[in-house]
């Protein structure tokens, strides 16, 4: 055993350096959040709870093209289109999403030509029963109305990358 190794073991240099390292981090601000009361920042591309959007005049955006239903890999979306209106457009009669099947891939949002179906910023939608995770058109439109300000802001921030 050489002299330097003996000196290091007697003087406990590793212990002292580790102690000073721990003290340096001990006095820094804590990086944790008090979660239910404080929330961290969310990316504009965050994929949370689904929502159906409306136009500013209150009309729903969905034109019943069924692209989101076709592209969904989990087959979680079910759409029934109503008859054509006088102006030639269609609207949905039934728009259901089975959130139990959904894998939050965002393909429905990418496929939609009118930005009708989006995945909003809400990530707190735990339920007590499984049936509450079957979203119908009314629930999706209510989500869209509730989160419209945040959704439109996120879409505007993401626009340069589309």
Curated annotation (Swiss-Prot):
Disulfide bonds: none annotated. It catalyses: a quinone + NADH + 5 H(+)(in) = a quinol + NAD(+) + 4 H(+)(out). One of its GO terms (cellular component) is plasma membrane. Keywords: 4Fe-4S, Cell inner membrane, Cell membrane, Iron, Iron-sulfur, Membrane, Metal-binding, NAD, Quinone, Repeat, Translocase, Ubiquinone. It is a peripheral membrane protein. The lineage of its organism: Bacteria, Pseudomonadati, Pseudomonadota, Alphaproteobacteria, Hyphomicrobiales. NDH-1 shuttles electrons from NADH, via FMN and iron-sulfur (Fe-S) centers, to quinones in the respiratory chain. The immediate electron acceptor for the enzyme in this species is believed to be ubiquinone. Couples the redox reaction to proton translocation (for every two electrons transferred, four hydrogen ions are translocated across the cytoplasmic membrane), and thus conserves the redox energy in a proton gradient. SUPFAM superfamilies: 4Fe-4S ferredoxins. One of its GO terms (molecular function) is NADH:ubiquinone reductase (non-electrogenic) activity. InterPro entries: 4Fe4S_Fe-S-bd, 4Fe4S_Fe_S_CS, NADH_quinone_OxRdtase_chainI. It is found in: Cell inner membrane. Its cofactor is [4Fe-4S] cluster. [4Fe-4S] cluster 2 binds at residues 72, 102, 105, 108. It comes from Bradyrhizobium sp. (strain BTAi1 / ATCC BAA-1182). Pfam families: Fer4_7. Its EC number is 7.1.1.-. [4Fe-4S] cluster 1 binds at residues 62, 65, 68, 112. NDH-1 is composed of 14 different subunits. Subunits NuoA, H, J, K, L, M, N constitute the membrane sector of the complex. PANTHER family: NADH DEHYDROGENASE [UBIQUINONE] IRON-SULFUR PROTEIN 8, MITOCHONDRIAL (PTHR10849:SF20), NADH DEHYDROGENASE UBIQUINONE IRON-SULFUR PROTEIN 8, MITOCHONDRIAL (PTHR10849). Binds 2 [4Fe-4S] clusters per subunit. Residues 52-82, 93-122 form the 4Fe-4S ferredoxin-type domain. Belongs to the complex I 23 kDa subunit family. This is NADH-quinone oxidoreductase subunit I. The keyword Cytoplasm does not apply.
